[in-house]
Amino acid sequence: MKNYKALESKILTGKYDDKNIHSLFLPSFGAITIQILQILDHFKLPKNENEWALQHGRVTEKAYQFRDLQTDSIKLKEIISYEKAEQLANEIFNKQKEILSVADEMPISWTSIDGHTTHLTTADKWGNVVALTQTIGPTMGSKVASKGLGFLYAVTLGGYLGKYKPGDRANSHISPTFIEKNGK
């Protein structure tokens, strides 16, 4: 912790319908969030929950193929390109044969009402917006806090495990994102 330094965040921008999407660059996966929304923008709204789940699953699976390419500035522009999203949407659409019932196939952890993530968003009268997402794991995380710091540690790194060396910043699928319409 003594070598940790907070860095200024880079904001990425995309579009969905008539709205602007603003999300964070790495270590957050804001580029992937933008890509998912832009791909979805090329589909009709699903008729029911099963279609919604299948559509979002396919779109997310397609977008996640680009996770490791976010560090390349040329690939990053392609990832958040609306034209690339249209191409990917066409690939997904062309592979769809039929809508299956997926509710019975979902792991129980995907449908559990018990959660351990808190998200807060607030705005003031001048339009300043702050969002905070905190995930520490079930039952208050590790139940360990450093004296004087005022926060609990996560129980597990879960999805953050990977090819990290000392000093690397762990990437996060948590991507604070703001949707803006008409400048608001």
Provide a role label for each language-model segment.
Residues 45-135, 149:
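Internal maturation/activation junctions in enzymes
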Residues 22-44, 167-184:
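N-terminal accessory/precursor segments of enzymes
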Residues 21-30, 117-121, 133-144:
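Glycine-rich phosphate/pyrophosphate-binding beta-alpha loops
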Residues 1-22, 26:
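Long, well-ordered, tryptophan-enriched scaffold segments
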Residues 128-184:
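Active-site rim segments in enzyme catalytic domains, especially the processed small/beta chain
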Residues 7-8, 114-117, 172-174:
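Short, small/polar residue-rich loop motifs at catalytic or cofactor-binding pockets
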Residues 11, 119, 177:
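Conserved beta-strand and immediately adjacent loop positions that scaffold enzyme active sites
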